[in-house]
Amino acid sequence: MNRKEAIELITRKIGNEPIICSNGYMSRDLFYVNDKTTNFYMVGSMGLASSIGLGIAIKNPKKRIFVFDGDGNILMNLGSMTTIGTIKPKNLVHVVFDNNSHESTGGQSTNSEIINLEKIAQSVNYKTFVAGNKKRLEFILNKIKSETGPIFLKVKISKTSKIGSRINIDPIIIKDRFQRSLIQ
């Protein structure tokens, strides 16, 4: 399963729930697959989607907030996981797409083959799940509908050579439409 296939499945299952999406190819794929006003695309802030997602979850306790992170992104900001685990937002679902690569910056390897991200998440009070194929991912997405967070879902994906188009919406417009979507 590649990133785009995983994003298609997840967005189909979660509907219009808000998504804070990390920078790079992840945001491009989400934009291509399912652009909506409830998506907040990180255009350039590597490693900060989880921190922003936490703030959004705290201020919007009645909405389920999804964070889409890459393995490279979360490894840059592991401290956010300890903060999330301490605050324990019941409405936060942290999805980490793991291809063992900083794919957006040239494909350099991350340490995710050596570092057990789900054990780190579990040690800081997340409920953890791992999906390595579409069937398992769909099963987990159905299961977590009735779970409270924080939830950590690692999705093992393959690298891809297909690069999505750049997001053609001004970052100010992305912010404005996302903010409006939260008050509706």
Please provide the spans of the model-predicted regions:
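Glycine/aspartate-rich loop-and-adjacent alpha/beta segment that forms the canonical ThDP
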Residues: 36, 146-184
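Active-site diphosphate/adenylate-binding microenvironment
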Residues: 1-46
